[in-house]
Amino acid sequence: KVYQANGVPRCLGLALTNLSACIHLFIMSLMLYVAAPLVFNAKTPENPGAYFFCLAVYMAVSLGVASVIGLAVKDPAKTPMLSIAVFLPSTILSGIMFPTALLPKGLAILGRMFPAFWGYGIMTDSTCQPEKLLPLLAMFILAVFACILLLGKTDT
């Protein structure tokens, strides 16, 4: 709304918001990448180049989904609630918080519909396997098309 009030095109507002979020997420990821081995005695990825590529792919998909939510929900007070409704189950059902083997089969299958499942899978592998990137690519393409459609709609 602030961008519209000042005459800034919605697509520029979307691009700037995503750029800012991407920079912040990357800085946080770098901090965790450095701190995790020191604080938690975690292993560093065997192939840092593949790890950061997979991180960039996962961030792009997550920001795409967040962009769809931001463009689709007209009431700013409802946007965080819908984001929580999408991203919290994504985290819970992906295997990040606990192994998916502990979930009932139906919930484990449902978890595969969320980006976090595939993002976690590619980031924990030592190599970035193309067959694990395809679902994320499909989600990203769907998010881009949804954003294009939502940007094309006029506000009423």
Where are these regions (language model features)?
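Transmembrane helix-loop junction
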Residues: P37, G70-L71, D75, G95, ...
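Hydrophobic alpha-helical transmembrane segments of multi-pass membrane transport/permease proteins
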Residues: L25-S29, S83-T91, A138-A146
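Short helix-to-coil transition segments within interhelical loops
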Residues: V2-R10
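A residue-level signal for alpha-helical anchor/packing sites in multi-pass solute transporters
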Residues: V2, Y33-V34, V68, W118, ...
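Alpha-helical transmembrane segments and their short interhelical loops
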Residues: R10-M81, L88, P130-L133
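Short hydrophobic, aromatic-rich alpha-helical segments embedded in or entering the lipid bilayer
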Residues: P99-L134
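Transmembrane helix segments
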Residues: V73-M113
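Junction motif at the cytosolic side of a transmembrane helix
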Residues: L38, T127, P135-T156
